[in-house]
Amino acid sequence: MLETETGRYSDTLRSALVSLDGDNAWALSESWCGTIQWICPSPYRPHHGRKNWFLGIGRFTADEQEQSDAIRYETLRSSGPGGQHVNKTDSAVRATHLASGISVKVQSERSQHANKRLARLLIAWKLEQQQQENSAALKSQRRMFHHQIERGNPRRTFTGMAFIEG
């Protein structure tokens, strides 16, 4: 279990994120995706008249971008003030992260080595920002899934507190 969101009552879950892997993981998830109906009076709301409860099960693929550390550096002349030093040395650096295509240009320092170090730090920061954005988008997609549960037309039906399929 990768992530859980606790329910309103003790020992309940509002949401759970489970990871499956192996040869039959896709087929197993396919057999469960959709609406699951549970027919049973609620143990948490005994006087409630409803006995049909619906659960939504969906498949979400993780964004598994393997980020390599391969960075291509290009040196070029800086622009702006600096006199003869700027005009004669290639101290500016354009760094490109090969896996993601993120590119930065750094010319704030006088030395090429210092600019390379800053470029590496900038790329690392941008990669972290990109990963956080992707994670937030996936979390938002899972949150919206809660509101899209189809009540009716269940893929599987279970009855009773023992959760017996039938």
From Swiss-Prot:
Pfam families listed in its UniProt record:
RF-1 (PF00472)
Q: Name one GO molecular function term.
A: translation release factor activity
* PROSITE patterns the UniProt entry points to: RF_PROK_I (PS00745)
Output the InterPro entries linked to this UniProt entry. Answer: Pep_chain_release_fac_I, Pep_chain_release_fac_I_sf, PrfH, Prokaryotic/Mito_RF
Function according to Swiss-Prot or TrEMBL? Could be involved in translational termination.
User: Which family would the database say this protein is a member of?
Assistant: Belongs to the prokaryotic/mitochondrial release factor family.
Spell out the protein name for this chain. Putative peptide chain release factor homolog
Q: Which organism is it from?
A: Escherichia coli (strain K12)
